[in-house]
């Protein structure tokens, strides 16, 4: 089992992008992206393996991606606040190019579970590594993701298999709830536990 772990850690480390993204599959075109959901679980597994620097780089990459596309969140939150329905293809995507850009290939982008999973993974990383300073560094992105989830959790979205985009999925809501609950331990924002309780 130790050999399997060391080989797995080696592959993940080798294929992690210079920016910190975890590629789903480097040799298959449709999967040469980083999914927040998958990447967050990979970061957690790297934390469990003691590879804190790798997980740290991933979380900083997610932070840079959220900051890069923060106006997209602002637009979505504004539309929802005015009772308007955002274009599903204009939502925050489930996956990103490794450089943090957004692909326009028509992939079903609207999946909220990845954003909740990231909050959980970030909180887990801080708890396991003791790198509490990461919360201050990523605070702006944490707040933006909470705004996004608060605006969108009731809306139909794709599930973790990227199917059934016309439904609201308990598995997605569980990821959002779990992420909000986990990150609320580190962020002093009374709205976060209230939102989790509402979900």
What are these regions (language model features)?
Residues 1-199:
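Acidic, mature catalytic/reactive cores of soluble proteins
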């Amino acid at each position: 089992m130790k050999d399997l772990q060391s080989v797995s850690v080696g592959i993940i480390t080798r294929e992690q992008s210079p920016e910190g993204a975890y590629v789903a599959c480097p040799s298959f075109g449709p999967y040469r992206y980083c999914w927040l959901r998958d990447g967050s679980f990979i970061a957690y597994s790297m934390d469990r393996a003691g590879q804190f620097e790798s997980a740290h780089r991933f979380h900083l990459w997610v932070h840079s991606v959220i900051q890069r596309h923060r106006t997209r969140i602002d637009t979505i939150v504004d539309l929802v606040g005015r009772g308007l329905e955002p274009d599903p293809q204009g939502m925050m995507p489930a996956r990103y190019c490794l450089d943090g850009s957004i692909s326009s290939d028509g992939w079903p982008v609207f999946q909220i579970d990845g954003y909740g999973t990231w909050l959980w993974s970030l909180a887990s990383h801080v708890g396991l590594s003791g790198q509490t300073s990461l919360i201050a560094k990523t605070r702006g992105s944490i707040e933006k993701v909470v705004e996004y989830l608060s605006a969108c959790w009731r809306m139909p979205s794709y599930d973790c298999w990227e199917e059934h985009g016309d439904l609201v999925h308990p598995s997605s809501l569980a990821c959002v709830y779990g992420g909000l609950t986990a990150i609320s331990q580190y962020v002093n924002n009374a709205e976060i536990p209230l939102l989790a309780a509402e979900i």
